Structures are given as structure tokens and as C-alpha cells.
Amino acid sequence: MDFCFMIFYNSLSGQKEQFKPIEANKIKMYACGVTVYDDCHIGHARTYIAFDVINRYFKYRGYDVTLVRNITDIDDKIIKRANENGESTTELVERNIKAMHDVFARLNILKPSKEPRATETIPEMVAMIETLIKKGYAYQGANGDVFYRVTKFADYGKLSKQNLEALQQGSRVDVVEEKENPMDFVLWKMAKEGEPAWDSPWGAGRPGWHIECSAMSKKLLGDTFDIHAGGSDLRFPHHENEIAQSEACNECTFANYWLHSGMVKVNAEKMSKSLNNFFTIVEVLEEYHPEVVRYFLASTVYRSEINYSKENLENAKASVERLFNALRDIEPIEVNLPDDASEYEEKFIKAMDNDFNTPEALAVLFSLAKEINTLKTTNKYKASGYAYLLRKLCDVLGILFTDIEEYFKQGDGADASEIEKLIAERTQAKKDKNYARADEIRNQLQQQGIILEDSATGTTWKKG
């Protein structure tokens, strides 16, 4: 495939740019991962589905992708929550990592190439901090904590497009006497009694949040890599601080491209626990199928805000069912691809090559679905070729990953086990020649949107 014309918005430059990897046909990408102090929420799903789609698209375009997505497994929030729960930080972290992996798998998010934990990279963090101190970019305060000296880094604010003076004036950072400047941030924090701690030249303590990502990306991707990704809420101060640390330490560009995913709003309001509109992924999946949730979160351009509402989820559900229905009763066969199928794929690529425009890409999929539905009764051979292409392109977006009939059986309405019981009762009623009861059961299921199909081998069902 042609590698020349992919463009996307680079938060660092503030404009769309043609993508040029450091090494031909290879991409090194880092995505800030979850701080595992609590269950993952719908905002996490938005971010990691957005970057999963991008990762899948890079691979579809032929790139060899190394995606590093870290786990922050030591943090003030983790210590606080573990103390509140009366458990160790290890117990809390391990439980939440497992829960994260479980919900990400349900949403069909691919595993990253590498998934480092912050606690596995402590020596590299210490080494970076030592280098920053030697170069004059860091200092130790009176209480033992080590801070980054932001005034030393001339480019501070280049990602968030703010100069240091403006940041200082608008700063809500708590005044800490040990800091030379209110904007200085912690690199190494001295441990209090009973807290997890690691040895360092400055005393037992733990790393600051920002240095964790700088050290993990350096260790696994090198001093300079292609793409750094994360939620737009991390742009400042986290990503700004990563740049300051890494570029001061390594004396080279940190990441060439920065991708930031848009935030989730709930009924047009900011999602927050205080507004009682905060939803975990598990809570959302109790009401909607993973296919619907993934489609909904992937259907908006990755860097735009997305509005979480029942209406939008119901629309996503209808869209998923339209695509699944197109693939019903037709076997996708690659060798049956029509000559003009390439036109659909080219339109799909054109959409995704332009800043990963998933709404336009999905429009292509619905055009394909319409073509398949038209051809089902007139040219099944051609329809099966188009069905193969639809499946292929859906896989690039990570949608339609469930077996078709299983999806419809898991939809709203009667429980699958209850349906099977009623079908068994209906089968017995027919054997007993109690046709009135058999018809009654069929009608009962039909009212719940369940269609029965009788054959010589038995009765199957699907959601209509």
C-alpha cells in the first residue's frame, strides 16, 4: 500500500501534517495508560478505542507498529484508595489491572505490543533524574523531594501553546515552600511511613507521575519516537512535563507527533462524580452490548468531544444492527470480490488517511451494506464478495467482532436461556399435537422480537 499520503492533526504544531515515520514502514507509538486505582470509566473506553482504531488502521496500511501502553501502578491516588479499602497497594493494583484487561477485551481493544508497569522502570527513572540534576534542570528541596526547574527549559509550554509567565499567572498549583517556582513539579517524592518506597540517591521514595512515562517510553522506544498519544485532559500538565523532562535529559525531540483524543460529555455536561453522571465501563455494558458501545465511541472523529446519551447509544445500536443484517444469510467469500470493490476500499482509505475520519469511513461501510442487501436476491455471488470486503473493513475499525446470530441473541428482550426453554416446550407441544400451545409460544416470542425458524434438524431463533 502507498505510505505517502496519510495526514493527521499534530497537537504539537497545531495543524494537520503529512505523516513521515522515523524508520520507513515502522511506527513507534506510546499511549499513556490507566492509573489503576479504580474501575475504568467510559472516558477510558473512549480514549483507548480511539487509539485502538488508529493502531488497527496503521497495521491495515502495512506498518509494523510497536504500541507501548503503560500502567501507572504507583501513585498518590493508589496509596489513598488502598488505605481507604484497608488493603495493600499490590492487592488494589492487581485487581484493577485484571478488571481493566477484562473490559478492554470485551470492547475488542487489541493488546499493546508492550505494557510496562511504572514500578518495573524505577532504575531508569532514577537515572533520568540524576541526569537532570547534573544538567541543572532539577534540584532537591529541603524536605528531600526532587523538583524539575521549569524556568531552565526554554520551550516549556510549547505543547499547550502557553508561555511560562501566563501559566504562572493562571496557576492553581498549591504553593510548596521547597519549590523555587510554583510551576516546578515533583520528580521524586520522599516516602511517608508505611508507604511503598524504593531506594534512591535522595532517600527512600517513589517517582513523580510525569517522570514515569518519560522513562518507560525511553526504555522501550528510544529517545525519539514517532507518536505520543493520550487523552486531551493530559495535554497539560502531564504531556508538557514529559516533553520538558525528556528533551532536557536526552537533548533531542521527544515525540514527532502528538495525538489527543476528545473527552466524553454526558448529556452535554462534563462527566464527573459530583454531577452523578459518571459511568464505569462495566455499568455501561450492563445496558448495552460491547458492539454498540464500541461503535458509538468509534463513530466520532477521535479528537472531537463525544456526547454520551441514551439517544446516541440507541442510534449506535440501530447502526450496528444495520451492518449485521447486511451480513446475515450471506457467506463472505474473498474470491468473489467484484472488480469495482476497490472503489469502496479506496474511499475508506481516503477517509481514514485524512485524520482518521471514522464518520466518513463508516459512511462507506453503509454504502457497502446497502449494495449487499440489493444483491442478496439478484446476485448472491457478487453479494458474497462485497460481504467479504465489509467484514474486512469493519475489522479495521474493530467492529462486528461478535458472531452475527450470537449478537442478536444477546440483544434486548428475553433471556437466551428462557427462549431456549420456551422453544423446548414448543417442540414438546408439537410432539403432543398441542398446536394451540405451540402457536401461543411462537406468538409470545414474536411479541418480544424473537423469530423462530423451523427445519428438519430443529428450531433456531434470532432477534428480528
From Swiss-Prot:
Motif stretch ('HIGH' region): 34-44
CDD domains: Anticodon_Ia_Cys, CysRS_core
GO biological process, one term: cysteinyl-tRNA aminoacylation
GO CC entries: cytosol
UniProt GO molecular function: ATP binding; cysteine-tRNA ligase activity; zinc ion binding
Domain of life from the UniProt record: Bacteria
Keyword Nuclease: no
SMART domains xref list: DALR_2 (SM00840)
Keywords: Aminoacyl-tRNA synthetase, ATP-binding, Cytoplasm, Ligase, Metal-binding, Nucleotide-binding, Protein biosynthesis, Zinc
Reaction catalysed by this enzyme: tRNA(Cys) + L-cysteine + ATP = L-cysteinyl-tRNA(Cys) + AMP + diphosphate
Residues passing through the membrane, by range: none
Requisite cofactors: Zn(2+)
UniProt KW Repeat keyword: no
A Pfam family hit: tRNA-synt_1e
Chain sites annotated for binding Zn(2+): 32, 213, 238, 242
UniProt motif 'KMSKS' region: location: 270-274
Stored InterPro entries: Cys-tRNA-ligase (IPR015803), Cys-tRNA-synt_Ia_DALR (IPR015273), Cys-tRNA/MSH_ligase (IPR024909), CysS_C (IPR056411), Rossmann-like_a/b/a_fold (IPR014729), tRNA-synt_1_cat_dom (IPR032678), tRNAsynth_Ia_anticodon-bd (IPR009080)
Cofactor binding note from Swiss-Prot or TrEMBL: Binds 1 zinc ion per subunit.
EC number: 6.1.1.16
Protein family per UniProt: Belongs to the class-I aminoacyl-tRNA synthetase family.
PANTHER family on file: CYSTEINE--TRNA LIGASE, CYTOPLASMIC (PTHR10890:SF3), CYSTEINYL-TRNA SYNTHETASE (PTHR10890)
Protein name, UniProt field: Cysteine--tRNA ligase
The gene coding this protein: cysS
